[in-house]
Amino acid sequence: MEFQEALKYIPSNSICSNPNYKLIWKKIQQYSYEVNSSSSLILSDISSSSYDLSGIFEKSLMIFLMIENFTTQYSNQSYLYRFLNEPPINNNNNNTKSEFQQIITDPSNKESLKSLLQFSKTINISKIFENNTQPIIISPPQQSQQPPPPTSGNNFFSILSSNINTINNNSNNNNNNNNCKSYKKQQTSKGSATASTNTTTDIYDEQQMKLQQLQQQYYQQQLNELQQINQQISQKVNLLQQTTPTTTNTSTTATTTTIPPSPSNTTTTTTNNNNNNIPQQTSISTASTSIKIISEDGVSNNKRKRRPRAPAPFLDSLYCHSCGETQTSQWRRGPDGCKSLCNACGIRFANIVSKEKALAVKEKNISINMLLNESSNQQQQQQQQQQQQQIIQQQQIIQQQQQKDDHLPLSRPSSFSSQSNSQQDDSLPLSRPSSFSSQSSSSSSSFLSSLLSSSSPPIPSTTTTTTTTTTTTSPTISSESLNFSSATNTPTNLSPNLQSINHNDKLINNNNNNNTALEGFPPTFNINNYNNNNNIDKLSSSKDSTENNGYNYYSSYNNYNISEYVPSPAYQNSRMTNVGIGSFKRKLSNEDQLNGLSAIVTASEQLFFGISNDVNQGSNVKL
């Protein structure tokens, strides 16, 4: 019988009216759910013959009897009795009937339904779920026999097998009593009959006896069939129990039932259908139950109150994967993500995970700080390398410039007199003019002034910068500035490669007859004393010098070219040309200045080539 079919015969308002009804209704729900689950399992694999149908038969019969008992208690009328006494229904409406109604209304099943009706009146199903777990048989008062003790468990067929004899005796006694009552009524109604009717009464008595015998035979046959069915079922159950049961992973929900307080015992029983300590078997009928008795105050009979143990919510096993515990107050998640750990192991695992997370965060922070430090160090190293490379490049540029300046054919810087004695060793790219005496300056100045005033244009101002001192001179070279007056002893720029020398400078030793190498390159000269002759023939180098009466005579200067000590015009045409030796550099950035300088050089060449070759006494020449 299905659950939806039971709702048709049980009024919904009657469930909450009596606690007994609630108990029966909960049991109907439980058994109907188990019947549906087991039947669906069997239908999913019809080819397999290892399924036991005894559990389905047992629970469906229990549902049937509980509904019968429920309706009789509520409405004082059995619905089974109503089906048996109803007139037959047309076969056209069989399609609209349910399967249960078709079975009940089938005439071939009428005798079986009658036996079930008598069986439901004899046994009280509601007494099965009490603490003693044995049915109470309704027997007449004259019977003093007690039912034998039930077998272990709540097996319904064990209850049937233990009470079949009592049911048989009760049914026979009820039939005899009914027959006796009817017989007495018939005798009282026929008391005034004549003697002719005595023969008919004897015949009637014989017929009644035959009817009773037939009824007894029928009942005996029905009981024998029930005994055979019970034996077959018990044999199958024993075979299943003897074989090794295979554990299943399905877990059933625990159900709690409450029995109303009775004067003898006011207790509530809680049944748990999934005791984790005992493995479940494939047969649903052999599911174990554990009963825990708790008083109305909520205090258990044990020494201490324990929280209810939750079953494992995973399907692979029913134990803790760490410690093997099968019961715990709460199942916790393990490393696999499933709730496979008990409460204690789960707490320990959570603490370990939290510590590992904290360590991972610390390691991440440390690694980030290390990367930041490494990046900052690398940036500093790169900056230092760039600075070093820049310094090296600057040094290389300075060295290249110095090498270029060293190879240029420029005049050697000599010391010159100035206001401060500290600037005597500084070198100048353009030599200072040599100082002439007051006697010879007038003739040379007049000659140069006449040349420069007629041929050379005015020279723009130039700026020379020294590295040792920050003095800046910007003389303007013109024809007026080249005035060699005898009154003023200021030096005059004769040539960029000619410098004036002092009397303290080293001269050629006129007393010795040796030709040693002279200091300084290129050769410069200084004429201190000479006659007022306007023409000097020629000068000779130190290689051609000869000693004559303590005086130096120079000759063969006609081939001497002073322009070889001046930079070439191609070199002078550059916009920024460094002229000088050492730290002193002069920048020539104007073409007009270069033109003026070349004019001075040509004038000096004409001057010296026009001088007479004979040099008077008192002339000292330093080469």
From Swiss-Prot:
Bias (Low complexity): 167-179, 410-482
GO molecular function: transcription cis-regulatory region binding; zinc ion binding
Gene Ontology terms describing biological process: regulation of transcription by RNA polymerase II
Protein name: GATA zinc finger domain-containing protein 6
Bias kind Polar residues: ranges: 185-197, 483-502
UniProt keywords, alphabetically: Metal-binding, Zinc, Zinc-finger
SMART domains named among the record's database cross-references: ZnF_GATA
Domain of life: Eukaryota
Zinc finger motifs (GATA-type), residue ranges: 320-345
Sequence segments annotated as region (Disordered): 137-156, 167-197, 245-289, 398-509
CDD domains: ZnF_GATA (cd00202)
Family annotation (Pfam families): GATA
InterPro entries according to UniProt: GATA_TF (IPR051140), Znf_GATA (IPR000679), Znf_NHR/GATA (IPR013088)
GO CC field: nucleus
